[in-house]
Amino acid sequence: MWRPTSASAETTKTPLTICWIPIKRWVSSASLPCGAIYRQVWESAAFAGFLTGREAARRMVGRGRGTVIFTGATASVRGGPGFASFAGAKHALRALAQSMARELGPKGIHVGHIIVDGMIDSDAVRSKFPEKTAALPVGGMLNPDHIADAYWGMHAQPRDAWTFEMDLRPSVEQW
């Protein structure tokens, strides 16, 4: 399992904070979601991302360094049938990340957006989608440790070569 090394923690002298905000309901038809559902999904992704990013940036600007990484999905760049609420929220989160990156980059804050495109290999996913996960080929789901490595790699980039966005997906994922 991935863990930051004690050497990396000692050299940065910066606390590592991770914030995860799950979206509980994200599948809805463009013709069916009521305003309350659309708003709930938007608040869980876009507005929560804004609040979290704003508060993190406020604390980082004074130090002149820090990293804020937002997690996207395929819906960040492409809507699909049945994903109206989720796609709208993820598009908004990606636009927020772009705006923050342009504003905060010159102040030493690295803002990035990582699109996680595919099923994540976990007990929760395997129990919720047993038939689908069983049918996947070896390497058909994203390994959580490999996802963490990508996030850490983005965080550790030198200032002269910052990545704004990367896509993570299994090699067999259709995209």
Ranges and model annotations:
Residues 6, 23, 30-50, 93:
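Catalytic Tyr-X3-Lys loop
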Residues 53-54:
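A short, exposed helix-loop element centered on a Lys and neighboring polar residues
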